[in-house]
Amino acid sequence: MPNSTTVMEFLLMRFSDVWTLQILHSASFFMLYLVTLMGNILIVTVTTCDSSLHMPMYFFLRNLSILDACYISVTVPTSCVNSLLDSTTISKAGCVAQVFLVVFFVYVELLFLTIMAHDRYVAVCQPLHYPVIVNSRICIQMTLASLLSGLVYAGMHTGSTFQLPFCRSNVIHQFFCDIPSLLKLSCSDTFSNEVMIVVSALGVGGGCFIFIIRSYIHIFSTVLGFPRGADRTKAFSTCIPHILVVSVFLSSCSSVYLRPPAIPAATQDLILSGFYSIMPPLFNPIIYSLRNKQIKVAIKKIMKRIFYSENV
């Protein structure tokens, strides 16, 4: 039987063993992190300060931006610090925290994107019932339900992963802890864990994806029935950013499972993990800022207010 000594720390992979490349990785990741953080903070500020954006759609957009800022903060700053300090170690407790938080934020973000699709569906297809179906009380209830179910979901997967013995190695082929990489280190049978991941991912991810697609089929069939003009343009301007955000999020997550044989597994893991941990939080505020007219107007108003107060 393999030696099943308790692993108290793990070793994460470097992007490079060359010191100058480690510095380059740290600097580039830190810049992307700052841009992402500022973009999401801007969305939160705009949707909070502008009273014209105090609507359910922007309530969920604000929550999504807070979530994105937290999500990228779980992995990227630690990776930057490790590169600067030339360190690859992470404690078992730190690894548990990373796994739990990554699973939690990904799960809740998927639910938020689904709720936002439902919000657009009701606004476009059932406008007369919108104030009743999507009111402030319902918004808060859906948010709390997403967060609480996320805690249960993340706790279930984190607990089932770390109850396994790790004895093959303590080297994780990622720049942060994630469940697929940890399962490869276990010396026990991980079949039940893998089945649970696949079933839950298909159940949650597949269910949300089908709901989002169904919502937008109804939305576009309704919008195309509008006469050409301001109403159709406004409907498209609020829906298209959300479709782009959903596409970036789902494509970045699904790309983790696409592994071309020409690229070594370790390199592939690092590239894909960097992609799905950075791209969705980075692009979400950019997409909403560029494609949503109300957001652009609100940003201009806040900028004018800031510059005016400075000049005074």
Curated annotation (Swiss-Prot):
Keyword rRNA processing (UniProt): no
Disulfide-linked positions: 95-187
Compartments where found: Cell membrane
Transmembrane parts of this sequence: 24-44, 53-73, 98-118, 138-158, 195-215, 236-256, 270-290
Residues in coiled coil: none
Glycan attachment positions: 3
GO CC term (a single one): plasma membrane
Extracellular side, ranges: 1-23, 74-97, 159-194, 257-269
Cytoplasmic side: 45-52, 119-137, 216-235, 291-312
PROSITE patterns: G_PROTEIN_RECEP_F1_2
Keyword annotations from UniProtKB, A to Z: Cell membrane, Disulfide bond, G-protein coupled receptor, Glycoprotein, Membrane, Olfaction, Receptor, Sensory transduction, Transducer, Transmembrane, Transmembrane helix
InterPro entries listed in its UniProt record: GPCR_Rhodpsn (IPR000276), GPCR_Rhodpsn_7TM (IPR017452), Olfact_rcpt (IPR000725), Olfactory_GPCR (IPR050516)
The keyword Membrane is assigned to this record: yes
Record membrane topology: Multi-pass membrane protein
GO MF annotation list: G protein-coupled receptor activity; odorant binding; olfactory receptor activity
Primary localization: membrane
Function: Odorant receptor.
Family from the record: Belongs to the G-protein coupled receptor 1 family.
Record's protein name: Olfactory receptor 14C36
Organism: Homo sapiens
Taxonomic lineage of the native organism: Eukaryota, Metazoa, Chordata, Craniata, Vertebrata
Gene field: OR14C36
